[in-house]
Amino acid sequence: MKVVRIYTGADHQTHFQDLDVEAFATLATKVGEGAVRVNQGPAKSFSDFHNAPRRQYVVITSGMMEVEIADGTKRQFVPGDVLVAEDLTGKGHITRGIGDDPRVSLSVPLGE
């Protein structure tokens, strides 16, 4: 299980931060208000630069996803991996569905 946080830095760009499971366990108990969503996308999908719609964590349940930040760095996520999305401002990130299987993920709002 890989846990990666994306956040907006002082430079208004999105950055990656690897989290250990214990750090994620602390965040995961702070569920915020709003709906838990199941997101489905085709195997080959693309969403240009955008910000996270809210502080949330995204659990990949099937398929593969790639996230790219402004400096060109990319990370790939497979089932069981978690993306903690907190880049609410700035340039944001790109997401891609990769591989041959449709992508399904679970988005859970984070509280403060």
Residue ranges and their predicted role:
Residues 84-88, 98-112:
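A short hydrophobic beta-strand segment most commonly corresponding to one strand
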Residues 21-24, 34-52, 75, 87-90, ...:
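Conserved short histidine dyad/triad with adjacent acidic residue
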Residues 1-40:
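A short, N-terminal "cap"/entry segment at the start of jelly-roll beta-barrel domains
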Residues 40, 50-67, 109:
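Short, conserved beta-strand element in jelly-roll/cupin
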Residues 9-10, 61, 70:
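Short, ordered coil/turn segments that flank beta-strands lining enzyme active or ligand-binding pockets
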Residues 36, 46-47, 64-68, 82:
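Short beta-strand segments in beta-sandwich/barrel cores
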